[in-house]
Amino acid sequence: MKEKLTIIKVGGKIVEEESTLNQLLADFSAIEGYKLLVHGGGRSATRLAAQLGIESKMVNGRRITDAETLKVVTMVYGGLVNKNIVAGLQAKGVNAIGLTGADMNVIRSVKRPVKDVDYGFVGDVEKVNAGFLAALIRQGIVPVMAPLTHDGKGSMLNTNADTIAGETAKALASLFDVTLVYCFEKKGVLRDENDDDSVIPVITPEEFKEFVAQGIIQGGMIPKLENSFSAIDAGVSQVVITLASAINEGSGTVIKK
């Protein structure tokens, strides 16, 4: 029987505010068994870029990562945000280690090819070093992963944190009984976006298609759910979309086959 592993993905909005970060770290610390945290950090990067006189360019909500911006996100994601989380977890007795994809070749990516938009130094994940992560986890060490990967040729790459969480979950699914939790600003996937209590408790692939056709699920939630079903297909036991403050409550939307 596989040992349980919980992978939590949190956005920058949560980890950049002291009050919400402290609550998250307390809730994360209370998770029993093996665990791993993946974080974002976009607003901090935007702020530092502005202070340095570097313009932040976004297309469809995605950051364009030119050479100067890459320096900023590497400093912020791999440094400031990541180490604040690690220090906070250590203070709560959690033996955490901060990682980017370059550390021990944890995640190697390929630079995204230019199609309609040139996103610059943005990585699409090629390989996750599951063996190394599993070795850390089984020693009781908790990986805290920044949204940065590398190309194996000496360059860092800015990489979507949702993608890192999903690909890491898939890679570890053969070794652990993995639950992947995407922390969201809502209580889960909503039947009515104007009613915060209209949470859909369970979504199957068939229901997902119906909800999209009916316009109940739309926009950025569609790729999030597509990634969730991809993780399930790759052997992840369960994917949950819920509030960051509810990761120990068993609430939210569960994605199932």
Swiss-Prot record:
UniProt cross-references to Pfam families, sorted A to Z: AA_kinase (PF00696)
Domain of life the protein comes from: Bacteria
InterPro entries named in the record: AceGlu_kinase-like_sf, AcgluKinase_fam, ArgB, Asp/Glu/Uridylate_kinase
Catalytic reaction list: N-acetyl-L-glutamate + ATP = N-acetyl-L-glutamyl 5-phosphate + ADP
Enzyme Commission number(s): 2.7.2.8
SUPFAM superfamilies: Carbamate kinase-like (SSF53633)
Keywords assigned: Amino-acid biosynthesis, Arginine biosynthesis, ATP-binding, Cytoplasm, Kinase, Nucleotide-binding, Transferase
Cellular location(s): Cytoplasm
Residues annotated as transmembrane: none
Main location: cytoplasm
Record has ATP-binding as a keyword: yes
GO MF entry, a single one: acetylglutamate kinase activity
Pathway assigned to this chain's UniProt record: Amino-acid biosynthesis; L-arginine biosynthesis; N(2)-acetyl-L-ornithine from L-glutamate: step 2/4
Residues that coordinate or bind substrate: G41, G42, R63, N158
Segments forming a coiled coil: none
GO cellular component: cytoplasm
NCBIfam families (UniProt xref): argB
PANTHER family: N-ACETYLGLUTAMATE SYNTHASE, N-ACETYLGLUTAMATE SYNTHASE, MITOCHONDRIAL
Task performed by this protein: Catalyzes the ATP-dependent phosphorylation of N-acetyl-L-glutamate.
Identification of the protein by name: Acetylglutamate kinase
Upper taxonomic lineage: Bacteria, Pseudomonadati, Bacteroidota, Bacteroidia, Bacteroidales
